[in-house]
């Protein structure tokens, strides 16, 4: 579902959004919200909430709510960016160290506790491969900046694992064979009761998506010396989430690559 969201929502957010360099797709900030909605209302509930959130975001953009971004203190922007970085960093530790955990908690502190409790399952081979990848990414720019170091790291470490037949998890071993078919239109099973129940989660998704995308756009502005269009960004986010939901995707927002 995340891949479908990156394709569908990513296209609409990039095409209609107001930032030249910001990408769109599912982000770590939505994990807790998505988990709660699916647990209580199922996949159809999440799809309805995503579509409603998209409609709310479009309305916010039309009403020019994006202009309010200028009143947000810069310290919030900095803290927000650091928070995302820490969340993503901690989220990758399980796979980096090859820890064997049946179910990883979605909450930050519980996730850290689970890592500590299962530290004895560390896979040294997986850790070494991860370290090699980091070293390549750090030092490759000294060789050339025409090819991204991350791409070179993926190619080299994948080749090492494949030819040496190292005992580490791969995308195939963890997720199985990926569906190569393009996502199809999916109309959720609607009922007035479900729509009413999804209004509150939809507002939560819309507000979080709006704030995250606009703050990320501000960060992107600082990187390239440009100014984004806040209201257009909200409309793009809204359209991205509407179509993401219609094709069975999950909530999406703008983010820094």
Where are these regions (language model features)?
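Transmembrane helical cores of multi-pass ion-transport proteins
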Residues: 1-257
